[in-house]
Amino acid sequence: MASVSMRDMLTAGVHFGHQTRYWNPKMKQFIFGARNRVHIINLEKTVPMFNEALAELAKVGEKKGKVLFVGTKRAASESVKEAALASNQYYVNNRWLGGMLTNWKTVRQSIKRLKELEVQSTDGTFDKLTKKEALMRTREMEKLEKSLGGIKDMGGLPDALFVIDADHEHIAIKEANNLGIPVFAVVDTNSSPDGVDYIIPGNDDAIRAVQLYLNAAAQAINEGRNKDVAAVAEKDGFVEAE
């Protein structure tokens, strides 16, 4: 089962928080102390909390649930996309558009438009347009792909959010809270854990730390889905005798 050790976290720098002057008092219980005016996160709390979160993500995977990975800042953007693709899930890694969850009806219309433009770009429709019109549609398609490309095949609201940087993605967390969607989030010492169902106290800036969270999350989801496949095969008598 997917799990992360204390050594893994130390190597990735998960324990380094923000400068002490930027701290959020709501994170006090997860802080071990300070070194050179930088808060040190208590990994004795992070390790079991993260592993509990991974176990829950595996359950979402087992139920064929949809997980939306959210991380729009530069340190997380590419890794968020990679983790989502590696686990056949969905992502928002550019900019969170207000109402992405709470106004899904409108978002669905934009996704429909994106898919129409994608078809037009390959079926010869663009070739029949003037250069200016074709350019305008291409730009519209690229803009929509940038903001909605990671959710265009989601087909409805997600069953869980996995967020890198609770402070930066507070709008996404609030929308998920309003809809009762469980939130898994990395919460650094400058952030509030409010609204996060599965808190992962840790560094949300170091690329190695971000990759550690995301790789483990993707692995947990995949393991959950594979467990379900194995269970179905066994039930149907497809498991070969050893």
UniProtKB/Swiss-Prot annotation:
Q: What is this protein called?
A: Small ribosomal subunit protein uS2
Question: In which organism is this protein found?
Answer: Vibrio cholerae serotype O1 (strain ATCC 39315 / El Tor Inaba N16961)
What superkingdom heads the lineage? Bacteria
Q: What are the cysteine partners in each disulfide bond? A: none
- Ribonucleoprotein: present as a keyword of the record? yes
Keywords, comma-separated and alphabetical: Ribonucleoprotein, Ribosomal protein
Pfam families membership: Ribosomal_S2 (PF00318)
CDD domains with a match to the protein in the record:
RPS2
